[in-house]
From Swiss-Prot:
Gene encoding the protein: aroQ
A UniProt-annotated Pfam family: DHquinase_II
Site for Transition state stabilizer, residues: 19
Subunit structure: Homododecamer.
Binding residue positions for substrate: 76, 82, 89, 103-104, 113
Protein name as catalogued: 3-dehydroquinate dehydratase
Pathway annotation: Metabolic intermediate biosynthesis; chorismate biosynthesis; chorismate from D-erythrose 4-phosphate and phosphoenolpyruvate: step 3/7
Listed EC numbers: 4.2.1.10
PANTHER family reported for this sequence: CATABOLIC 3-DEHYDROQUINASE
Stored PROSITE patterns: DEHYDROQUINASE_II (PS01029)
């Protein structure tokens, strides 16, 4: 059975391609997800990508991952990275290994964006590589 990997996209990532492309790049979320789906096919893993602007919906999807056989999570919690104890607690509760991904380099941004509630629980953190960060995370997840 193929490894099951869940990619979670947080708030405002549905606006990629038009929202501050000088920070987040010009690719849309659909283009990022299409690229990940193609790579997942090459790597022989089952991939589900999911986006929500709502904290509770992200928490519920993380909780559902514990029951649906998800083996690994790749998460860009976006703004919730810096504010959400609920998402942190959900990730801790399900104990599914995860990588935290950010399109922009958090450490070159506003000081309030430089704290993550998730990083100390994550297997790893990829920040500032644009959409390539998702691909790096997927390649790692496929091997572990």
């Amino acid at each position: 059975m193929a490894q099951r990997i869940l990619v979670l996209h947080g708030p405002n990532l549905n606006l990629l391609g038009t929202r501050e492309p000088h920070i987040y790049g010009s690719l849309t979320l659909a283009q990022i997800d299409q690229g990940l789906a193609a790579l997942a096919g090459q790597l022989g893993v089952a991939l589900t990508s999911w986006q929500s602007n709502h904290e509770g919906a992200l928490v519920e999807r993380i909780q559902a991952a514990a029951a649906d056989g998800t083996d690994f999570i790749i998460i860009n919690a976006a703004a919730y990275t810096h504010t959400s104890v609920a998402i942190r607690d959900a990730l801790a509760a399900v104990a599914i290994p995860f990588i935290e991904v950010h399109l922009s380099n958090l450490y070159k941004r506003d000081s309030f964006r430089q704290h993550s509630y998730l990083s100390d629980l994550a297997i790893g953190l990829i920040t500032g590589l644009g959409a390539d960060g998702y691909e790096a995370a997927l390649r790692y997840a496929a091997r572990h």
